[in-house]
Curated annotation (Swiss-Prot):
InterPro entries: INTS14 (IPR039841), IntS14_b-barrel (IPR045814), IntS14_C (IPR046471), VWF_A (IPR002035), vWFA_dom_sf (IPR036465). It holds the Pfam family VWA_2. This is Integrator complex subunit 14. Residues 3-113 form the VWFA domain. Its main location: nucleus. It comes from the Eukaryota. Keywords: Nucleus. Component of the integrator complex, a multiprotein complex that terminates RNA polymerase II (Pol II) transcription in the promoter-proximal region of genes. The integrator complex provides a quality checkpoint during transcription elongation by driving premature transcription termination of transcripts that are unfavorably configured for transcriptional elongation: the complex terminates transcription by (1) catalyzing dephosphorylation of the C-terminal domain (CTD) of Pol II subunit Polr2A/Rbp1 and Spt5, and (2) degrading the exiting nascent RNA transcript via endonuclease activity. Belongs to the multiprotein complex Integrator, at least composed of IntS1, IntS2, IntS3, IntS4, omd/IntS5, IntS6, defl/IntS7, IntS8, IntS9, IntS10, IntS11, IntS12, asun/IntS13, IntS14 and IntS15. The core complex associates with protein phosphatase 2A subunits mts/PP2A and Pp2A-29B, to form the Integrator-PP2A (INTAC) complex. It comes from Drosophila melanogaster (Fruit fly).
Amino acid sequence: MPTLIALDASLSMLRPVPGRNEHTYQSLATKGIQHLLDNLTAAGKLEHVALLSYSTTAELKVDFTRDYDQVRQAVKKVEPVDKACLMSMLKAVVSIMSPWGNQNILQVVVFTDCGLGFGNTSITGFLEAYAEKESEPEFGFLKTLANYNLNFICLGLHGDYYFTRGLAVYQQLLDKVSLKGQLFMTKPAKSSDAVEGNPNPNPNPSHKSELGRTTVFELIERLCEASYKSSEVTLKCGSYFRMEASVLLWPPTAPYEQKSHIFGREPTIRHTDQKIEVCGFLSLSDIGSPATLSRHWVLPKVEREKSGSSRRSGNLSAAAKPPKLNLDTSNPNYELEKLEADIKEFYAKDSKDTEESGDDDVTIVLKPGPQTEQQKENLCVLLHGALKMENMAALVRVGDKWYGFIYAFTDSKKKSNLMLNILPPGTNVIPWLGDLESLGFPEDLAPGETASFPVRADRRSYSQSSVVWIRQASLQSDVQKVLRHAKKMPDKTQHFYKELNRIRRAALALGFVELLEALAMLLEKECAHLSLNGASNDCTLQLQHAATELRKTSNRDMKSMIVPLQKVGASDAGSTAATAPAPAYMY
């Protein structure tokens, strides 16, 4: 989920905040960006962040990176230039975000004082032009921009007329252009004359409590709560009661708008379930690369340890005995719990935890202290290790007739994590797998029956060079290569048929059957030309054979091959050339 931070670099950002002479709008925006980066750092440093400053033109200060310190340093160096132009910034956002595609959740966070701009480049001027020319190509970038989440951190006072007017125009922009966005603004301060029973109303109320560093931090907290909060779900694997744990999905799952097949019916909004259940396991090679709606990190939920305990109690905890596990005999899982407790107790007896006493045959066992949250067994760790070792993926159910798969993903830094790919709703969303609800086990096959899945290819896609005929010169080059090999037969017979079959398969794959007839005519003309120039008999026979085979309907199959003409018999070794019979050929 990449995030682009846009900072307003207009001259109006240099104004001091009324009631807070130590702060300007730009300094508050800088502190807000720093606080946003701190929140992203606490979330696990999973976000790619870029920094953009805009005025009349937009300038990319820092490209997408996970090095937040680089962004922090660049924010301090942004200097205001001239007037603000929001539309130039939005066009630059579309260009910068284009490499990420539309499958990712793209966030744009804009820090501004809600200036409208001047002249034709103002927001009001844009709305007037857009109302009359919505279908013009110059407004085509708005269709792409509608896929982004626009978050405006509005810095201003509700007592300022220009700020409140700017808020209304910004909201009008989001509504008319149908953009997904939200305005984050401070709450208006209560004036003293609004309080009932106040005998001394203050005509000049202070803005001290309305806009400041604390209120900007509150805006950032609201933004993170709305857009950067992980989805907490329960991951269940099998019927064993211990194989269930709470996990976090990052980025959070978004509602899916499923269109209705009935004309005129409203689309259905679907949400993923709070419990994700593992249905089975498949090889990664069988799944391949199907189309997915979204991808999410699967992170274990770790409770932070409380720091209130003293140092002495922390030292004594290592030597203290762990609380004895009291098992309830009436529990239906009593036998499984007892077996698990015995196994843990057996493997906990390490040689390092034993100590020999002075008496013979006496051993004192030192019990380890209670485990921390990071040392406890976790379902994510177990599932990640198993999937990575076996090179498999877990098929999971995320909703009613809605599936996805979890696998171990390794990034460019060779760090491996669990990744959840959510498929489109339905049971037949991976064509080569068929109905996901009809999958079974390999053991269900009858004796002697072989699995028809997966369908094996005759050749690997990389076994032979690919054929590209986008331009006319490429096709001419391939045909001329065949004719060059034809002139050098019988020395180049194998090369001739190899190139001929390559062109034939490419033509059949593209439905270019006319090329086979044209190639047969070229081979016949080349045969007549070579026979006049005294070419060998083998060369002319091979060319006639190739032209005949190209016209056969039986060779219109992709799996068939045109092979060279083979000799049936040959002359005796001792006979002379005059008495030797002519060699025969077999089709």
